[in-house]
């Protein structure tokens, strides 16, 4: 399927120059998805959908398992080649003293917290003092933080963690009117769809869905899948993403599979996702895949699946926070979690700060279409490399530091800078 997002993804490839013979990289969303595939024995007839059997004969994806396995292998390959962020900022001295607020979105999600911590580290080193807000995902906290940025004359707010700026557009417009620039992380739509937002970074989502479906069918050996999707359609673009996911799922699985959708909005994730998933698993015992569409949902989905006492495999894009990656190195949990499609929190944070600094220095920001960072499918096989930073390499750190007028790092200091939040 050709999509606008797919076109933007292709355009970004010029920023990673793969070494000769090295694997190409997928550029995909930080917006998280998870596939929790129940053991095949859990498959049964679908309530409200087509019956599901153990046969692969009627599943189109089963005919392409070799290709799907290649897709999964490619997605889990390490990043190779050199990286160039964009133009240098020669007047970084003019930014010294400008205050920046790092708003994690929620400190309860490891990757969101680690994104914000990295921005604080970079900004403090560059002379732009960064204040990090300790929020827990409540919209009222985000509104309050923006109000603080206005009254205390901050220059910018970096709003991290997925597409959450879409939920407080009026507050962002108020900040714009007061001269405070708000930047959004991992946006999924063009900037014009976010009134008041000064800029940010883009993460197209369709290729995520495609890769995760590939992984699900590989994990189930091409057998029929009955899937529960957890959406949050109040987030800009998510309703369209649900429609695209349904279309791709139907194309890959035909009439042998069934998809259920439960919508839980961001403010309700902490209280409603776990009981919603538990209820759906009880109501529809044929469900063998649970697919949260945002990284923050995974935290609440996994306990619900575990409480169902059904043998499960887990794969998805949970955001790459250290605790989640470490689960794949644990002998007990790595038999459950078989994949995590994610960007490097450090790399993503550098890109976000770089965009902010470009704008504050009066330079032209990079187009959103050029701002998303390379993702890797983390598995039990490469989780160790991810935790040491080796999967993404360390070169990107000094590339950004050069453009930001910061001295290069080497040795242990470079590795430490590249692995904060991995």
Region locations from a protein language model:
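C-terminal motif of bacterial Sec signal peptides marking the signal peptidase cleavage site
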Residues: 38-42
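Hinge/cleft segment of the Venus flytrap/periplasmic-binding protein
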Residues: 57-97, 344, 349-422
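Extracytoplasmic "Venus flytrap"
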Residues: 56-65, 69-118, 122, 131-143, ...
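Venus flytrap/periplasmic-binding-protein-like
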Residues: 183-192, 291-335
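Bacterial lipoprotein signal-peptidase II cleavage site
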Residues: 43-55
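An alpha-beta-alpha
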Residues: 100, 104-105, 109, 119-121, ...
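Flexible loop/hinge segments that line or gate small-molecule binding clefts
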Residues: 61, 166, 171-207, 226, ...
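Hydrophobic alpha-helical segments within soluble ligand-binding/sensing domains
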Residues: 83, 87, 199-227, 240, ...
């Amino acid at each position: 399927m050709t999509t606008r997002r797919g076109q933007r993804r292709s355009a970004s490839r010029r920023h990673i120059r793969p070494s000769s013979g090295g694997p190409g990289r997928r550029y995909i969303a930080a917006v998280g998805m998870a596939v929790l595939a129940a053991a095949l024995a859990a498959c049964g007839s679908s309530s409200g959908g087509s019956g599901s059997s153990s046969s692969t004969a009627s599943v189109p994806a089963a005919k392409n398992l070799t290709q799907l396995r290649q897709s999964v292998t490619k997605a889990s390959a390490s990043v190779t080649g050199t990286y160039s962020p964009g133009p240098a900022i020669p007047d970084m001295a003019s930014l010294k003293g400008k205050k920046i607020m790092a708003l994690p979105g929620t400190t309860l999600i490891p990757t969101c917290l680690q994104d914000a911590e990295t921005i604080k580290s970079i900004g403090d080193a560059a002379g732009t003092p960064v204040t990090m807000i300790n929020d827990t995902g409540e919209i009222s906290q985000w509104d309050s933080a923006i109000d603080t940025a206005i009254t205390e004359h901050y220059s910018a707010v970096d709003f991290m963690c997925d597409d959450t700026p879409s939920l407080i557009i009026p507050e962002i417009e108020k900040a714009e009117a007061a001269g405070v620039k708000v930047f959004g992380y991992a946006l999924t739509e063009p900037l014009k769809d976010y009134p008041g937002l000064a800029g940010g970074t883009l993460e197209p989502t369709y290729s995520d869905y495609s890769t995760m479906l590939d992984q699900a069918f590989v994990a189930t050996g091409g057998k029929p899948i009955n899937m529960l999707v957890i959406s949050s359609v109040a987030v800009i673009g998510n309703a369209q993403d649900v429609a695209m996911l349904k279309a791709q799922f139907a194309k890959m699985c035909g009439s042998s599979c069934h998809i259920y959708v439960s919508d839980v909005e961001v403010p309700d994730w902490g209280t409603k996702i776990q009981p919603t998933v538990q209820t759906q698993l009880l109501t529809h015992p044929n469900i063998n895949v649970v697919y949260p569409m945002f990284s923050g949902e995974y935290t609440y989905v996994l306990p619900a699946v575990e409480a169902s006492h059904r043998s499960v495999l887990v794969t998805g894009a949970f955001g790459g926070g250290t605790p989640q990656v470490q689960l794949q190195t644990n002998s007990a949990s790595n038999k459950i979690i078989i994949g995590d499609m994610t960007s490097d929190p450090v790399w993503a944070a550098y890109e976000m700060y770089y965009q902010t600094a470009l704008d504050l220095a009066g330079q032209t920001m990079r187009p959103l279409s050029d701002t998303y960072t390379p993702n890797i499918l983390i598995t039990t096989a490469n989780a160790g490399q991810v935790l040491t930073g080796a999967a993404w390499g360390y070169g990107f750190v000094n590339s950004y530091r050069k453009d930001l007028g910061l001295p290069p790092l080497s040795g242990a200091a470079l590795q430490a800078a590249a692995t904060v939040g991995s």
